[in-house]
Amino acid sequence: SNPNNPAWICLTESELRTIGELATKYDTIVLEDLAYMGMDFRKELGHPFQAPFQATAARYTDNYVLMISGSKIFSYAGQRIAIAAISDKLRNRFYPALKERYGIGRFAESYALTFLYAASSGASHSAQYALAAMFKAAADGKLDFVGHTREYAHRAHRVKELFERHGFHIVYDKDQDEHVSDGFFFTVGYGSMPSSDLVAALLRYGICAISLTSTGSLQNGVRVCVSQMNREEQYDLLDRRLRDFAQDYARK
């Protein structure tokens, strides 16, 4: 995704290569969250079997588990479902420590029957059939799920412009030397105002966001999500509220 949640940046291809190579060197397993797969709108992703492809550490190591959410990439939010894609080499690997601790030594079985079984309530048959059908339609070029989610980029571009117009700045603004993409989330700050103070101040003007501090960030600011900006009048309303905020705080 871009920006990623809760890092607010996207790892570049060179960074992912480093992670993958180190995972192989030190025999470490990479758990890669691709919940917002394809939502880097700086690139023309989403054309099946055609470059460019989703950036991933899995290109550089066999020690990976990819987590992909149906509710995010397909906007299939009713019956929650996701997949954990394990490399063939890793899924068949036998770990004596897992056998001793859980009674199941092969990684895939231990991961599914010990961790996923305990951490989730499973998935309904209808959701499994639906996800399989959407994967097939996407692979066959019949479902442009990246194109459908591009709406979030349009919303983010408009909302970001409103915040910047009224004196806010983008906190996490670049992936190394490239500007972050417009996507589901972005981050803003207002001068040097602490995160918690900014959350409280915005609430007084009817604007809801979460503190960057709550996500482990050391930067001052808030996270903005554009998922509910789905009516034209909301942009005019946000513009007025941010204008009032800026006018009041410019006097302080």
What is each model feature region?
Residues 125-128, 132, 145-164, 170-189:
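Conserved glycine-rich beta-strand-loop-beta hairpin in the small C-terminal domain of fold type I
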Residues 1-47:
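Active-site phosphate-binding strand-loop segment of PLP-dependent enzymes
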Residues 60-61, 200-252:
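PLP-dependent enzyme catalytic core of the Aspartate aminotransferase-like
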Residues 60-150:
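Conserved core segment of the aminotransferase class I/II
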Residues 30-32, 131, 211:
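Hydrophobic residues in well-ordered beta-strands that form the structural core
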Residues 27-29, 63-65, 208:
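Proline-centered loop/turn at the N-terminus of a beta-strand
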Residues 32, 45-71, 83, 222:
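Conserved active-site segment immediately N-terminal to the catalytic lysine
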Residues 85, 187-189, 225-227:
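Short hydrophobic/aromatic beta-strand micro-patches
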